Amino acid sequence: MNEAMKREHMQQLMDPDAAQPDVRLVRMYESLCEACAKRPEGLNDQDQMMVADITTMEKLKQQLYEDIRKRGVVEDFRNGRQRMMRDNKSVQNVRMLMDQQRKHLAELRLTPNSRKAAPVSLDDGFDDF
């Protein structure tokens, strides 16, 4: 694991109201890095950056959940004398983040279906030629 990169990622996970990163996000970051390191190809810098993206998305997702708790799934909207109900855009954003997290986890081969797939072989036989 690249320790300098890890320190940078921990700074990104800092809670603005606290002096240290969110413990739950740190645990998530470390467990995903550990799971990547156990793979046959190990953990490289690109994988570590993707893990940081996943944990940052989790942080954003929690903020969106808080907004949904406060304002609800639909919100009252007023335009002059008109009053309407409209969808809370946080719901759509949470769905997008969840899909992106799923794609990142699949790319890291950390989902059950992605583990079943055969690993991509980069050996084209040129070395044997």
Question: Language-model segments: what does each one mean?
Answer:
Residues 1-86, 90, 127-129:
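Extended, surface-exposed interaction regions
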Residues 15-16, 92-119, 127-129:
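Alpha-helix capping/hinge segments and adjacent helical runs
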Residues 124:
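Low-complexity, rRNA-contacting terminal tracts
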